[in-house]
Amino acid sequence: MTISPPEREAKVRVTVDTDPVPTSFEKWGKPGHFSRSLARGPKTTTWIWNLHADAHDFDSHTSDLEDVSRKIFSAHFGHLAIIFVWLSGAYFHGAKFSNYEAWLADPTGIKPSAQVVWPVLGQGILNGDMGGGFHGIQITSGLFQLWRASGITNEYQLYCTAIGGLVMAALMMFAGWFHYHKKAPKLEWFQNVESMMNHHLAGLLGLGCLSWAGHQIHVSLPINKLLDSGVAPEDIPLPHEFLFNKSLMAELYPSFAKGLTPFFTLNWGEYADFLTFKGGLNPVTGGLWLSDTAHHHLALAVLFIVAGHMYRTNWGIGHSMKEILEAHKDPLIIGGEGHKGLYEALTTSWHAQLAINLAMLGSLSIIVAHHMYAMPPYPYIATDYPTQLSLFTHHMWIGGFLIVGAGAHGAIFMVRDYDPAKNVNNVLDRVIRHRDAIISHLNWVCIFLGFHSFGLYVHNDTLRALGRPQDMFSDTGIQLQPIFAQWVQNLHSLAPGNTAPNALASVSPIFGGDVLAVGGKVAMMPMTLGTADFMVHHIHAFTIHVTALILLKGVLYARNSRLIPDKSELGFRFPCDGPGRGGTCQVSGWDHVFLGLFWMYNSLSIVIFHFSWKMQSDVWGTVDPDGTVSHITYGNFAQSAVTINGWLRDFLWAQASNVITSYGSELSAYGLLFLGAHFIWAFSLMFLFSGRGYWQELIESIVWAHNKLKVAPAIQPRALSITQGRAVGVAHYLLGGIVTTWAFFLARIIAVG
């Protein structure tokens, strides 16, 4: 950290332009108003594709960085408005169409539902029996559990929140318009990273955590404590009563009677009755202790608020981003000019900034997926198996898409924003200069992992086919135990009293300990890892490395390669390097993203299959009064998942029976979706396995027929370009694949869970 005399630093100011862009519905009503060529209107059918491709590509509208920044800033408000409308809709469904109050009274006996189908064509069959006389569609979003944890005790509160969401959406819409058309920030405001870091860390994250901790302490904790002890929701005081009536709170948490005295006299331990460090899960609800999570958010709030005072603005004290980056160099690891030049790259390229943020947020989403099942954060979510499976799958896929997006915007940065003159011998330049070594080594790793991990399965299938189980890799044959993972599990289970001396229990029974049963179902129990997990883990390693190889190659070779030295002149997406140069197709940055999407999907399919089967086999199930656990698939993972045939027969085929035989039941919609999504997936292959010329010839013969009948269109039909065809192909491939998996998973887990 440095302290500098204030006069040396440029002052942080909020500077805006007033009325920079007129509000003109007439202009916006004209399709393609943002592009001179598109505004002329369609000559061929390609126009509609270009309209969609370029509508949000602000770089193509203008080269003025300030205007691009304002458009992105304004679009963020629009995005937030959509999110608020979407959330409001979810809360409204909870208020109007759900059995939330019935579920709250009996969360282990009643299934959550927030949608009732109108029987127009006999779809009434889809309204399954949720218990308590309610018929509807079972939901798996985890919202009921979240609402319970928030302290929502009736549907009227959900109505109020839904209306609040719409008010916020309107506010966001107004803000988006206001900050583009009325008072638009100047470029210097967007580029002031120290002020941005301070406000985002202290404001968004710090005060965000603090307000959530405050809500948890003053509203969630007392309401959940009463619910856990069996008080009926309608008998619990309303949130404002807990806020303003100290004696009500003091009955539940005695330290409330002392007010703020312990805080100001530094006797913070007095508050340990509601800010706990118990560890483990609440045996009543199977979720994390809410007093632990309140403590956690309070601690995070303190950290982030402190972090929000780290960067130097108008007071001459604190860190400077540029100085930090330019000081990052050492001869051993970083080398050369280190991070010099990155400050300029990140303050002039939104693509560079976005690539980093997408990579981080995508990784975070994947980490969240894994934490949410191992340490269930909300009451009764652990025993709601369909919700656990859905949330894991959802966060994995979101993370995968965001990481591929990071590769996309990294490549766009290289093509559109990278300036070689400003990156001489810094880390970026040095990575690009030894890209051949990076990519060839990564390729070797992929080949090694692929052949060896797949080879283990081929070996096992062969020996099982030949009737030699003792020579297979399995827990009962040749063992390949995941010793490092088992060591980490053991480390976690031994932490209380050792490395975590104040914790009463380890973070979750999943690492070791006793079975935690809630309502006769397993909420969480130790997960034994064995040879089958070791093998599929290396398949994960293989597919993740291939995805990384494709995306990284796309970024590092986005500007040029030995094959096409002038790639940056061709742009981010181009089909081939012109006629007369064979073997130059599928080399653009865009094509790497296209291929990366398939491997991301491939990779995550195996992850969610592994999770689904492992949990059904070794964790989820029923618990008898004598403590006997019966798992859903009776622990068949360890022996079946070591062969390819086992995966096909005992997972895909055996568990697809629920969706395939769903006709005539409330799960029949999943049966229809399963078939329909297979169709969409197959439809994608028509775009992926065909040539443009074939379609152009076909179109021309159809146009000839139209001319004969004198009904020729004014807009000339054109076959999709190579890139357009690929975009349509990958979109339908992923949509079909994801919906197929969704239908397969939900029909299965709702039937058995």
From Swiss-Prot:
Q: Does the keyword 4Fe-4S apply?
A: yes
Where chlorophyll a' is bound, by residue? 678
Record: residues binding chlorophyll a: 686, 694
**What's the superkingdom here?**
Bacteria
| Binding-site residues, phylloquinone | 695
The UniProt record lists the EC number as 1.97.1.12
Q: What is its main location?
A: membrane
- Name a single GO biological process: photosynthesis
Q: Which Pfam families match?
A: PsaA_PsaB
GO molecular function annotation: 4 iron, 4 sulfur cluster binding; chlorophyll binding; electron transfer activity; magnesium ion binding; oxidoreductase activity
GO CC, one annotated term = plasma membrane-derived thylakoid membrane
The record's catalysed reaction(s) read: reduced [plastocyanin] + hnu + oxidized [2Fe-2S]-[ferredoxin] = oxidized [plastocyanin] + reduced [2Fe-2S]-[ferredoxin]
Q: What membrane topology does the annotation report for this chain?
A: Multi-pass membrane protein
Residues annotated for [4Fe-4S] cluster binding in this entry: 576, 585
Function comment: PsaA and PsaB bind P700, the primary electron donor of photosystem I (PSI), as well as the electron acceptors A0, A1 and FX. PSI is a plastocyanin/cytochrome c6-ferredoxin oxidoreductase, converting photonic excitation into a charge separation, which transfers an electron from the donor P700 chlorophyll pair to the spectroscopically characterized acceptors A0, A1, FX, FA and FB in turn. Oxidized P700 is reduced on the lumenal side of the thylakoid membrane by plastocyanin or cytochrome c6.
> Which PANTHER family does the annotation name?
OUTER MEMBRANE PROTEIN, OMPA-RELATED, PHOTOSYSTEM I P700 CHLOROPHYLL A APOPROTEIN A1-RELATED
The record's subunit annotation is: The PsaA/B heterodimer binds the P700 chlorophyll special pair and subsequent electron acceptors. PSI consists of a core antenna complex that captures photons, and an electron transfer chain that converts photonic excitation into a charge separation. The cyanobacterial PSI reaction center is composed of one copy each of PsaA,B,C,D,E,F,I,J,K,L,M and X, and forms trimeric complexes.
State the name under which the record lists this protein: Photosystem I P700 chlorophyll a apoprotein A1
- Origin species, per record, is Trichodesmium erythraeum (strain IMS101)
- Higher taxonomy: Bacteria, Bacillati, Cyanobacteriota, Cyanophyceae, Oscillatoriophycideae
